[in-house]
């Protein structure tokens, strides 16, 4: 049997990108939620290359009296999951909770995640109830969740919700993975022995706009497909086999028709031949594009460049920067 250790210290990791309007309320509510735990805690805010005043506000929050805030400033924008991984590399708690800065998932849910983790779960996920997002966002999220469930076989309901809790050994395992394209909820479930999801409240976004545009969602789907599974490559092999068999069958059919109806039929079949040819060419280009995606990601990983570059770390115990 695996021994269940009680949670002694909680680390809350929050990526921040152009969220200066929501930061004061975010810090206040997250601090209040952590204070109610009766445990040691720290709040790590990672500025992901914001162009507004977010970074300056984080530094001030870390340097405030009796602060529990660690500010991590990245030199540019690397994306939500890379920013979270930067936070993971600086946590000191034995339970790590991730939270978005837009306050759509309320920080007041943190005690529930901690309580569930204390029951012995490695990963505590959440499912958003009554989502307050646009039709497009909800539809895209459903498609992504179904894609993940089919490719991984993990029947989790809401991979897009970043309000999650991870035991320290799960975070350490993720930090040992060096692929550039990382989707944290899936990666964590690969290493988790026991995982569970709980329902949480979902609010409308009060400040700013969502940072996930249409193209970023498309890129996310490409990342998920090429990072999670090689099934598309196997499907290409299957498609190639079907096309080859179909082409051979059509060739045999053309020979039979020519022998049956004479050479004059061949001229009348030119347009069909062109249609078949264009179908094969289109299938080849689709396959080449998919192979290019895989090869491009292999090339990116082989270069072994860091996921992010930390420009500055400000801890509450000292006003000196790391």
UniProtKB/Swiss-Prot annotation:
Chain segments annotated as transmembrane: 236-256, 270-290
Location of this chain's protein in the cell: Cell inner membrane
GO biological process: 4-amino-4-deoxy-alpha-L-arabinopyranosyl undecaprenyl phosphate biosynthetic process; lipid A biosynthetic process; lipopolysaccharide biosynthetic process; response to antibiotic
Cytoplasmic topology ranges: 1-235, 291-322
Taxonomy, superkingdom: Bacteria
Topological region Periplasmic: 257-269
Enzyme class of the recorded protein, top EC level: transferase
The keyword Transmembrane helix appears for this protein: yes
Gene Ontology terms, MF aspect: phosphotransferase activity, for other substituted phosphate groups; undecaprenyl-phosphate 4-deoxy-4-formamido-L-arabinose transferase activity
Stated family: Belongs to the glycosyltransferase 2 family.
HAMAP family, per the entry: ArnC_transfer
NCBIfam families assigned to the protein according to its UniProt record, in alphabetical order: PRK10714.1
Summary of the function given for this chain in its UniProt record: Catalyzes the transfer of 4-deoxy-4-formamido-L-arabinose from UDP to undecaprenyl phosphate. The modified arabinose is attached to lipid A and is required for resistance to polymyxin and cationic antimicrobial peptides.
Protein name: Undecaprenyl-phosphate 4-deoxy-4-formamido-L-arabinose transferase
Taxonomic source organism: Escherichia coli O139:H28 (strain E24377A / ETEC)
Gene: arnC
């Amino acid at each position: 049997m695996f021994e269940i250790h009680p949670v002694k210290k909680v680390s809350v990791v929050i990526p921040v990108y152009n969220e200066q309007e929501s930061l004061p309320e975010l810090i206040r509510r997250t601090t209040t939620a952590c204070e109610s735990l009766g445990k040691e805690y720290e709040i790590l805010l990672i500025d992901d290359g914001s162009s507004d005043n977010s970074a300056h506000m984080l530094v001030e929050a870390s340097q405030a009296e009796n602060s529990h805030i660690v500010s991590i400033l990245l030199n540019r924008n690397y994306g939500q999951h890379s920013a979270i991984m930067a936070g993971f590399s600086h946590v000191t708690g034995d339970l790590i909770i991730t939270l978005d800065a837009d306050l759509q998932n309320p920080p007041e849910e943190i005690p529930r995640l901690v309580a569930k983790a204390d029951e012995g779960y490695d990963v505590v996920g959440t499912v958003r109830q009554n989502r307050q997002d646009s039709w497009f966002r909800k539809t895209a999220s459903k498609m992504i969740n179904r894609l993940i469930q089919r490719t991984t076989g993990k029947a989790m309901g809401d991979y897009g919700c970043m309000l999650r809790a991870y035991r320290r050994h799960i975070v350490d395992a993720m930090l040992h993975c060096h692929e550039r394209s990382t989707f944290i909820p899936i990666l964590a479930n690969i290493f988790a022995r026991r995982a569970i999801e709980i329902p949480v409240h979902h609010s409308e976004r009060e400040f700013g706009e969502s940072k996930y545009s249409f193209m970023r969602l498309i890129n996310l789907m490409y990342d998920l497909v090429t990072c999670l599974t090689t099934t598309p490559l196997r499907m290409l092999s299957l498609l190639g086999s079907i096309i080859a068999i179909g082409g051979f069958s059509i060739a045999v059919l053309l020979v039979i028709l020519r022998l049956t109806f004479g050479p004059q039929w061949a001229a009348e079949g030119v347009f069909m031949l062109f249609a078949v040819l264009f179908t094969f060419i289109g299938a080849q280009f689709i396959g080449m594009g998919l192979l290019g995606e895989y090869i491009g990601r292999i090339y990116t990983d082989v270069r072994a460049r860091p996921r992010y570059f930390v420009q500055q770390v400000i801890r509450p115990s000292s006003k000196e920067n790391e």
